Protein backbone atom coordinates (compact mmCIF):
# COMPACT_ATOMS: atom_id res chain seq x y z
CA UNK A 1 0.00 0.00 0.00
CA UNK A 2 1.32 3.43 -0.96
CA UNK A 3 0.53 5.72 1.98
CA UNK A 4 2.44 8.85 0.93
CA UNK A 5 1.88 9.03 -2.84
CA UNK A 6 5.47 8.31 -3.93
CA UNK A 7 4.41 5.23 -5.97
CA UNK A 8 6.36 2.90 -3.67
CA UNK A 9 4.64 0.43 -1.34
CA UNK A 10 5.11 1.54 2.27
CA UNK A 11 2.99 -1.24 3.74
CA UNK A 12 3.55 -4.84 2.68
CA UNK A 13 1.60 -7.84 3.90
CA UNK A 14 2.18 -11.53 3.34
CA UNK A 15 -1.17 -12.94 2.21
CA UNK A 16 -0.12 -16.59 1.91
CA UNK A 17 2.85 -18.48 3.26
CA UNK A 18 4.24 -22.01 3.07
CA UNK A 19 5.01 -22.45 -0.62
CA UNK A 20 7.87 -24.90 -1.10
CA UNK A 21 11.04 -23.26 -2.45
CA UNK A 22 12.46 -25.13 -5.44
CA UNK A 23 13.83 -24.49 -8.94
CA UNK A 24 12.74 -21.17 -10.52
CA UNK A 25 10.20 -22.87 -12.79
CA UNK A 26 8.63 -24.51 -9.74
CA UNK A 27 7.84 -21.33 -7.82
CA UNK A 28 4.41 -19.81 -7.32
CA UNK A 29 3.88 -17.06 -9.87
CA UNK A 30 2.08 -15.63 -12.90
CA UNK A 31 -1.08 -14.30 -11.18
CA UNK A 32 -4.10 -13.92 -13.48
CA UNK A 33 -7.57 -12.72 -12.60
CA UNK A 34 -10.12 -15.17 -14.01
CA UNK A 35 -13.60 -14.31 -15.25
CA UNK A 36 -14.96 -16.10 -12.15
CA UNK A 37 -13.18 -13.54 -9.89
CA UNK A 38 -10.64 -16.06 -8.60
CA UNK A 39 -6.96 -15.18 -8.96
CA UNK A 40 -5.00 -18.07 -10.48
CA UNK A 41 -1.29 -18.70 -9.97
CA UNK A 42 0.99 -21.34 -11.43
CA UNK A 43 2.51 -24.15 -9.47
CA UNK A 44 2.09 -23.62 -5.75
CA UNK A 45 3.03 -26.77 -3.81
CA UNK A 46 3.44 -26.70 -0.04
CA UNK A 47 1.54 -26.39 3.24
CA UNK A 48 -0.19 -23.09 2.65
CA UNK A 49 -1.61 -20.76 5.28
CA UNK A 50 -3.35 -17.41 4.96
CA UNK A 51 -2.62 -14.36 7.10
CA UNK A 52 -6.39 -13.80 7.32
CA UNK A 53 -7.10 -17.31 8.56
CA UNK A 54 -3.93 -18.76 10.13
CA UNK A 55 -5.74 -21.80 11.56
CA UNK A 56 -6.58 -23.03 8.07
CA UNK A 57 -3.69 -24.95 6.50
CA UNK A 58 -4.11 -26.54 3.09
CA UNK A 59 -1.58 -29.02 1.74
CA UNK A 60 -1.30 -28.42 -1.97
CA UNK A 61 0.40 -31.08 -4.08
CA UNK A 62 2.16 -30.36 -7.37
CA UNK A 63 -0.64 -28.20 -8.74
CA UNK A 64 -1.65 -24.66 -9.50
CA UNK A 65 -3.18 -22.43 -6.82
CA UNK A 66 -6.16 -20.09 -6.74
CA UNK A 67 -7.80 -17.71 -4.26
CA UNK A 68 -10.75 -15.34 -3.92
CA UNK A 69 -9.43 -11.87 -3.04
CA UNK A 70 -12.58 -10.81 -1.17
CA UNK A 71 -12.63 -13.73 1.29
CA UNK A 72 -9.07 -15.07 0.86
CA UNK A 73 -10.53 -18.55 0.39
CA UNK A 74 -7.82 -20.61 -1.33
CA UNK A 75 -7.34 -24.07 -2.79
CA UNK A 76 -5.39 -26.22 -5.21
CA UNK A 77 -6.39 -25.97 -8.85
CA UNK A 78 -5.89 -28.36 -11.73
CA UNK A 79 -2.74 -27.83 -13.72
CA UNK A 80 0.92 -27.42 -12.97
CA UNK A 81 1.97 -24.51 -15.11
CA UNK A 82 5.46 -23.04 -14.97
CA UNK A 83 6.21 -19.85 -16.90
CA UNK A 84 2.94 -18.53 -18.29
CA UNK A 85 -0.70 -18.09 -17.36
CA UNK A 86 -3.34 -16.42 -19.53
CA UNK A 87 -7.12 -16.24 -19.93
CA UNK A 88 -8.82 -16.02 -23.33
CA UNK A 89 -11.98 -14.09 -24.19
CA UNK A 90 -14.13 -17.12 -23.31
CA UNK A 91 -12.61 -17.57 -19.85
CA UNK A 92 -10.39 -20.57 -20.66
CA UNK A 93 -7.18 -20.42 -18.66
CA UNK A 94 -4.05 -21.56 -20.48
CA UNK A 95 -0.66 -22.30 -18.95
CA UNK A 96 2.47 -24.14 -20.01
CA UNK A 97 5.49 -26.13 -18.95
CA UNK A 98 8.78 -26.18 -20.82
CA UNK A 99 7.67 -29.20 -22.93
CA UNK A 100 3.90 -28.56 -22.91
CA UNK A 101 3.30 -25.27 -24.74
CA UNK A 102 -0.47 -24.94 -24.19
CA UNK A 103 -2.38 -26.67 -21.39
CA UNK A 104 -5.82 -25.95 -19.92
CA UNK A 105 -8.13 -27.16 -17.18
CA UNK A 106 -10.91 -29.65 -17.89
CA UNK A 107 -12.12 -30.11 -14.29
CA UNK A 108 -11.18 -28.62 -10.96
CA UNK A 109 -9.95 -30.94 -8.18
CA UNK A 110 -13.04 -30.20 -6.04
CA UNK A 111 -15.30 -31.41 -8.86
CA UNK A 112 -13.28 -34.59 -9.47
CA UNK A 113 -13.17 -35.59 -5.79
CA UNK A 114 -16.96 -35.32 -5.37
CA UNK A 115 -17.39 -38.48 -7.44
CA UNK A 116 -15.35 -41.38 -6.01
CA UNK A 117 -16.05 -43.39 -9.20
CA UNK A 118 -14.67 -40.77 -11.57
CA UNK A 119 -12.27 -42.17 -14.15
CA UNK A 120 -10.60 -38.79 -14.70
CA UNK A 121 -7.20 -38.91 -13.02
CA UNK A 122 -6.09 -35.34 -13.73
CA UNK A 123 -8.04 -32.20 -14.41
CA UNK A 124 -5.73 -30.64 -16.99
CA UNK A 125 -4.72 -31.61 -20.50
CA UNK A 126 -2.61 -30.47 -23.43
CA UNK A 127 -4.55 -28.34 -25.90
CA UNK A 128 -2.16 -29.18 -28.71
CA UNK A 129 0.82 -31.41 -29.24
CA UNK A 130 3.39 -31.60 -26.47
CA UNK A 131 6.82 -33.00 -25.74
CA UNK A 132 8.46 -34.73 -28.67
CA UNK A 133 5.34 -34.30 -30.82
CA UNK A 134 5.72 -30.52 -31.03
CA UNK A 135 7.59 -29.10 -33.99
CA UNK A 136 9.36 -25.76 -34.03
CA UNK A 137 11.51 -24.28 -36.76
CA UNK A 138 14.14 -22.19 -35.00
CA UNK A 139 16.09 -19.33 -36.54
CA UNK A 140 19.23 -20.47 -34.71
CA UNK A 141 20.81 -23.77 -33.75
CA UNK A 142 18.98 -25.05 -30.68
CA UNK A 143 21.22 -26.46 -28.00
CA UNK A 144 19.70 -29.16 -25.82
CA UNK A 145 20.89 -31.77 -23.36
CA UNK A 146 18.83 -34.38 -25.17
CA UNK A 147 19.04 -35.24 -28.87
CA UNK A 148 15.34 -36.20 -28.85
CA UNK A 149 14.45 -32.58 -28.00
CA UNK A 150 15.89 -31.19 -31.24
CA UNK A 151 13.27 -29.23 -33.19
CA UNK A 152 10.70 -29.36 -30.39
CA UNK A 153 9.57 -27.09 -27.57
CA UNK A 154 12.20 -27.27 -24.83
CA UNK A 155 11.59 -24.01 -22.94
CA UNK A 156 7.99 -23.01 -23.68
CA UNK A 157 6.99 -19.97 -21.64
CA UNK A 158 4.96 -16.77 -21.67
CA UNK A 159 1.79 -18.35 -23.05
CA UNK A 160 -0.50 -15.47 -24.09
CA UNK A 161 -4.03 -15.51 -25.48
CA UNK A 162 -4.38 -12.69 -28.00
CA UNK A 163 -7.37 -10.53 -27.04
CA UNK A 164 -6.88 -7.59 -29.37
CA UNK A 165 -8.14 -6.79 -32.84
CA UNK A 166 -5.21 -4.80 -34.24
CA UNK A 167 -3.74 -7.81 -36.09
CA UNK A 168 -7.01 -8.58 -37.89
CA UNK A 169 -9.73 -11.24 -37.65
CA UNK A 170 -7.38 -14.08 -38.63
CA UNK A 171 -5.71 -13.73 -35.21
CA UNK A 172 -8.91 -14.26 -33.19
CA UNK A 173 -8.47 -17.27 -30.87
CA UNK A 174 -4.68 -17.21 -31.30
CA UNK A 175 -2.42 -18.28 -28.45
CA UNK A 176 1.25 -17.32 -28.60
CA UNK A 177 4.04 -19.19 -26.81
CA UNK A 178 7.66 -18.11 -26.55
CA UNK A 179 10.43 -20.63 -27.27
CA UNK A 180 13.56 -18.73 -26.18
CA UNK A 181 16.07 -21.50 -26.96
CA UNK A 182 15.01 -21.32 -30.62
CA UNK A 183 14.65 -17.51 -30.63
CA UNK A 184 11.04 -17.73 -31.76
CA UNK A 185 7.40 -17.37 -30.82
CA UNK A 186 4.87 -19.99 -31.92
CA UNK A 187 1.23 -19.29 -32.70
CA UNK A 188 -1.62 -21.76 -32.29
CA UNK A 189 -5.28 -21.25 -33.16
CA UNK A 190 -7.42 -22.67 -30.38
CA UNK A 191 -10.89 -23.87 -31.36
CA UNK A 192 -13.57 -26.02 -29.70
CA UNK A 193 -13.22 -29.76 -30.30
CA UNK A 194 -16.23 -31.46 -28.75
CA UNK A 195 -16.09 -30.98 -24.98
CA UNK A 196 -12.49 -29.80 -25.10
CA UNK A 197 -10.33 -27.42 -27.12
Question: PLM ranges: what are they?
Answer:
Residues 1-197:
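Beta-propeller domains with acidic blade repeats across secreted/periplasmic ectodomains
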Amino acid sequence: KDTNGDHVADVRKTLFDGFTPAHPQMQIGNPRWGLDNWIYLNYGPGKITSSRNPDNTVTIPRRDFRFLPETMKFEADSGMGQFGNTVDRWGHRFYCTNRNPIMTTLMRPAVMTRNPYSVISRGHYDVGKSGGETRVYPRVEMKSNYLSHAGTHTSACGVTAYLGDLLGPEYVNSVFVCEPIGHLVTRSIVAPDGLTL
